[in-house]
Amino acid sequence: MSDTLRAETQQTPIDGLLKREFFLIGCLGLAGLVVGGLLLGLQWLAQAGLIWAFICYQTKRRLPLNRPSTDAPLYKNLGWANRLTLLRAWFIAAVAGFLFQAWPEGPALSWLPGMLYLFAAVLDRVDGFVARRSGQSSILGNDLDTVSDAIGL
């Protein structure tokens, strides 16, 4: 993040509705990981949870960038494109839970990491399209897309 944007994010007050929406998405993501952890084990939950926590940290840090440009006002909500980007990041976190694990038993679990990554790849293409179509492209969305790309590699 550039120094100008960093200064901008420190000075911008965040709307309570935007904070609540982000908190709800973070909690839903964590709940989904806990359910997955019950099925896949504690190591999977720890690894996926660590990546999801990092994604939530990066998102919270960048919430003041939920605007089309630095001189524009903040959007009141995340918008569908940013929600899709966060869903994509959640899929990537779920895939990361399978790293350093024994090969999953059974055909369904063996294919699960690949299917999760496929969903993430499809959402990578869709989120930008949704942002442009809905007229809610944002600096936040661009940054989250880059963070998700980096983690997904």
Show where each model-derived region lies:
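Topogenic membrane-insertion module of multi-pass membrane proteins
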Residues: 1-114
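Acidic (Asp/Glu-rich) catalytic motifs at the cytosolic membrane interface
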Residues: 116-153
